Amino acid sequence: LGACAAAANGSLHFGWLAVTLLGIFSIEVAKNASGEIFDWNSGNDQAVQEQDRSPFSGGKRALIDNLLTQSQTAGIALACYLLGSLAGLSIVLWREPRVLWLGVAGVALAFFYHAPPFKLSYRGLGELAVAITYGPIICAGTYLVQRGAISTDVILVSSLLGILIGAFLLINEFPDYHADQSANKRTLVVRLGRKTTSRVFAGLAAIPFVVLFALPFLNFPFTLWLGFVAAIPAYAAIKRLLANPE
């Protein structure tokens, strides 16, 4: 999204876009790897019942299925955090120094999503952290690297994307409800209960489309309405979850 907005205002610098993507991908892999270790040590992954597992919930299963040892997983996390940090540092030194604070915030939110002392995902703050990171931080950061400026338009539109990604995470926490409870992982689903959270999900999934409808009347391009294609599966998910939140 950030790159598309940048392309609308000039030519893309594909080399720096590649470095940006390398940094983002590396930190994502690192976050998942370190998260495997913290979730394993908390007993969270072991508590997930087989019938509750899906491709989007129940953990990555790397340790559960003995695909990797803890040492190997820690090595992957360390290597990817280092690679992502080096990619970000190269951008700061040779392209756009102001991206430093967005990068630091992104790495911190990634690591402390699972890690103590903050353990954001264990305190009902993981959903917000994901929405902020995958929305404004990544998109505004990508635009900043390309155009050398912070765009309030990009921040606004990417916030809608962040809300949807946060809602996606939220709905995938439902199958982990009992496992998260047993490991004292206080996600929003655990904190609010599944019935209340189903209504929260409905609101989160609907808000971006309401704002999306209004944006073209505020000098945004009407092509944004192409995003309403996503309203069909969103409506289906809302209807199904409200009918059977348990």
Tell what function each PLM region has:
Residues 32-36, 61, 108-121, 169, ...:
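C-terminal ends of transmembrane helices
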Residues 9-34, 98-111, 151-171:
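Membrane-embedded alpha-helical segments that form the functional core of polytopic membrane enzymes
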Residues 53, 59-149:
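Intramembrane alpha-helical segments
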Residues 1-24, 123-153:
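Long, highly hydrophobic alpha-helical transmembrane signal-anchor segments
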Residues 128-177, 181-183, 195-196:
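Functional transmembrane core segments of multi-pass inner-membrane proteins
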Residues 23, 27, 31, 84-87, ...:
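Alpha-helical transmembrane segments of multipass membrane proteins
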Residues 12, 68-112, 203-246:
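Transmembrane helix-loop-helix
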Residues 34-78, 165-206:
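Solvent-exposed interhelical
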